[in-house]
Amino acid sequence: AAGLLGFLAGMAADLDVVIRSSTDPLLFLEYHRQFTHSLIFIPLGGVICALVLHYLLGRRRGLSFGQSWLFCTLGYATHALLDACTTYGTMLLWPFSDQRFAWNTISIIDPLFTLPLLLAVVLAARMRKPVLARFGLAWAVVYMGLGLVQREAAEEMGYALAAQRGHQPIRLEAKPSFANILVWKTVYETEDRYYVDGVRATLRPRVFAGNTVEKLVLDRDMPWLDPQSQQARDVERFRWFSNGYIARDPVYSNRVMDIRYSLLPNEIDPLWSIELKPEAALRDHALYKTHRDGGPDRASVLWEMITGR
């Protein structure tokens, strides 16, 4: 019962995805991983989960409400910290700060992390052997540690690559590519450009040379945009969400893209962007676009990068 309550409560924080607006396409970007993922919200999140789960599960298993609250709170507490280990950004200190914490040690989706952990928990529950759950916890800690080592190695490779080009980065980040911690995407910023590359860290190190794009300058790139318009405000909201890593799409000139994410680590092709319209009214919002039609070809290329072929 304790494990089930903790598991369900641990998933509850992501219910913030239902916070959306039919008139403001960017609203969900502000609220996903916001107050429900804040450290200060954890006790209240545990209470809310316990109010539901105690009467559905806890009471039937002979638990007091206090016990249900404790197990729900412990489960709920794991969610935000695990999310902060990913690359998306989590507002741990809301409402005191709107900083999005992203420790970049693991991909948002990584079966090599999730499946062994889930298997250990399920077997521990079915076989009534808590030691298996401890093995799962140990695996999670070890894997996160490996991700940290890999991130540091990827950043070192990124700085070395920048030095070879004669660049002194203003900032540089390394993020794991999709579903693994072997191949990483490095993004570094110079005075006027961003540079994106893929690197295979530690195991048979290798650089997958990428591309570069100019930083967004609204006066130059979109001179028609009214600074007082809602679209201009939406650009700044998207800049905050993207930690400043935004550029005009070189193919679609009215799109502003988040260059941090792509299906292949050495590409700039974004997974999402916002689209502005010159003819839009003053109060019209920018449109949010997703671009995830990579197909099997890109998946096979990523697999070759991971396996070192």
Labelled PLM ranges:
Residues 180:
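Short, surface-exposed binding/anchoring microloops in extracellular/periplasmic proteins
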Residues 1-156, 160-176:
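N-terminal membrane-targeting hydrophobic helices
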Residues 170, 183-309:
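Extracytosolic and intramembrane catalytic regions of membrane-associated proteins
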